């Protein structure tokens, strides 16, 4: 933690460092330079619990306590950043298994697909959080290699990058379980959650979102976020680097939530 800006540390943060009651990670660097993040230990558990309030299925299931698997880039996945090839045991952090160990899913060979399928069946995650592109490649290769893989989790979330309608339809044709979109970032947490009715809602607990018109468009916006969720590193007017397609709306969703903006996608 020597590289963390000492002048920004409050006494509360210094005490957390002394007691090792903190966790540190880096952003993946997909939209900007990698940033070091410091937050209270097990911060994501509370984040899952907050997010579940925007989807009745997740609320009933208490997914923050579920065993979870993550399939996304191997460079950096939330709490895990690997420079070498880690073992199965080394990729289990708390109740989460990180599945991918290669930088490019297009280079996955049959042995890679067999390993991923075997580890999922061995770990038995109730919830799988995936990059939709990675999952679609995995499903294609399972079919191409004729691998017998029957495991079905209780829920799948699609995050990390934009999921097109065709990819969503393809995934749903192969996996029969509740599937929903999530949008967020390592530094902020979850910002948008798809409800059980298929509508994206702002997860507005301790967070405020501002949409700035993008290149004079009336339907495209730059996403600016202010978040107080992480007491060690609050973000004010943070430029996410992502673009939102949205229209004004004050309609009440069938799930009971009312979102002032109809957000169609984020990328």
Indicate where each model-derived feature is located.
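Conserved AMP-binding loop of ANL adenylate-forming enzymes
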Residues: 56-94, 103
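Active-site glycine/GP-rich loop and adjacent strand/helix microenvironment
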Residues: 95-267
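Short secondary-structure boundary/capping segments
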Residues: 42, 85-86, 198
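Short, solvent-exposed polar/charged micro-motifs at secondary-structure junctions
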Residues: 2, 79, 190-192
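Short linear functional motifs in flexible/disordered or boundary regions
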Residues: 39-40, 63, 80, 140, ...
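Short hydrophobic/aromatic-rich motifs at helix boundaries and adjacent loops
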Residues: 23-25, 86-89, 139-140, 259
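Nucleotide 5′-phosphate-binding alpha/beta core
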Residues: 1-26, 31-67, 74, 122-129, ...
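Short, acidic Gly/Pro/Ser/Thr-rich loop/turn segments
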Residues: 34, 76-78, 230-233
């Amino acid at each position: 933690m020597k590289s963390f800006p000492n002048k920004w540390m409050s006494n509360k943060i210094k005490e957390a460092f002394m007691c090792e009651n903190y966790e540190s990670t880096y952003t993946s660097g997909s939209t900007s330079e990698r940033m070091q993040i410091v937050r209270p230990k097990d911060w994501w558990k509370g984040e899952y619990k907050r997010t579940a309030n925007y989807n009745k299925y997740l609320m009933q299931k208490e997914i923050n306590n579920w065993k979870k698997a993550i399939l996304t880039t191997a460079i950096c996945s939330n709490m895990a950043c690997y420079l070498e090839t880690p073992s199965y045991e080394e990729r289990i952090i708390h109740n989460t298994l990180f599945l991918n160990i290669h930088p490019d899913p297009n280079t996955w060979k049959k042995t890679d697909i067999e390993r991923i399928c075997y580890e999922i069946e061995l770990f038995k995650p109730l919830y799988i959080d995936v990059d939709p592109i990675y999952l679609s490649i995995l499903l294609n290769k399972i079919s191409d290699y004729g691998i017998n893989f029957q495991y079905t989790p209780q829920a799948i979330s699609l995050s990390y990058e934009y999921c097109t309608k065709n990819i969503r339809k393809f995934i749903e044709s192969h996996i029969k379980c509740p599937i929903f979109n999530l949008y967020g970032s390592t530094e902020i947490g979850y910002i948008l959650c798809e409800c059980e009715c298929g509508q994206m809602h702002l997860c507005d607990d301790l967070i405020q979102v501002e949409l700035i018109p993008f290149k004079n468009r009336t339907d495209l916006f730059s996403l600016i976020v202010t978040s107080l969720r992480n007491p060690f590193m609050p973000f004010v007017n943070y430029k996410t680097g992502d673009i939102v397609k949205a229209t004004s709306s004050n309609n009440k969703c069938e799930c009971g939530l009312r979102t002032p903006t109809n957000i169609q996608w984020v990328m």
